[in-house]
């Protein structure tokens, strides 16, 4: 592919950006997108109609943490957004007013007894820090003093609300560690899951802790863009279910780009998947050959974003530009709290 960003750019009216989810969640629009056919609008609760008995649906079971923290170092105010936990137990974070931070600096969080020590100032607003507590004590600390790191396009002048605490969590949430919600999962309700079960569609989960980098557009060139690493895991049970589904001719249906990116990171050339644990920074763009995923359910993404490039790689750039033009013309709602599309993979 070329390094031209123009095919991945489009004008999105501001009033198309959803600031609240659909209620109920499964009443949001689901746009069925198939290469070579016009976009076909439905609603989320229709999802089972487009899947087949024996298909395997895979969702991300990460749970969002309260990743935004207000810290001080002496008189200086430092804003932190936790990005991902590192192998040594410290945290990578994006920091505002971080220029003067240096190793061994101690950060305080109001009157809370928990502190953090700066391990490294990486520059460009990135730091690694170690907290004075871990495990359940750390989780309790985040609940006391942290706030949800809502995407910047969900405007909350007074910060995230109690309603956001409920709205920005998926029905699959199990393992804490994500900065951002895997938003395709936000649409699922117990009723939708029951309908999938009734049709004989299997379900498994994986874990990818979504980092703050998911919000970043490509600002320079495609070739120069560097993806942020995110930690994920596919356990042996899920890997076996994928391989069994593939062997008997079923399709792998990824709920969200996070699930797809981890599946493709773990996939072998023949489309089978091994148990996997570690960090991935996979950047999927047109020209990529998909190995693991056949169908993708995902929300509508930002212009010039790596996620829009991913869906263009999956279903074809012209197909996705047509689908997004349809969505804009028909008032569909974009981004985290918005509507979704069900994408069939281009041949």
UniProtKB/Swiss-Prot annotation:
Cellular location(s) = Cytoplasm
Out of the domains of life, which is the source? Bacteria
User: What does the record give as its pathway?
Assistant: tRNA modification; tRNA-queuosine biosynthesis
UniProt keyword annotation of Transferase present: yes
Q: Which residues form a coiled coil?
A: none
SS bond list: none
Under which EC number(s) is this enzyme classified? 2.4.99.17
* Record Gene3D superfamilies: QueA-like (3.40.1780.10)
Keyword list (alphabetical) reads: Cytoplasm, Queuosine biosynthesis, S-adenosyl-L-methionine, Transferase
- Which GO biological-process labels does this protein carry? queuosine biosynthetic process; tRNA wobble guanine modification
Give the record's subunit note: Monomer.
**HAMAP family this protein is in?**
QueA (MF_00113)
PANTHER family attached to this UniProt entry: S-ADENOSYLMETHIONINE:TRNA RIBOSYLTRANSFERASE-ISOMERASE
Q: What is this protein called?
A: S-adenosylmethionine:tRNA ribosyltransferase-isomerase
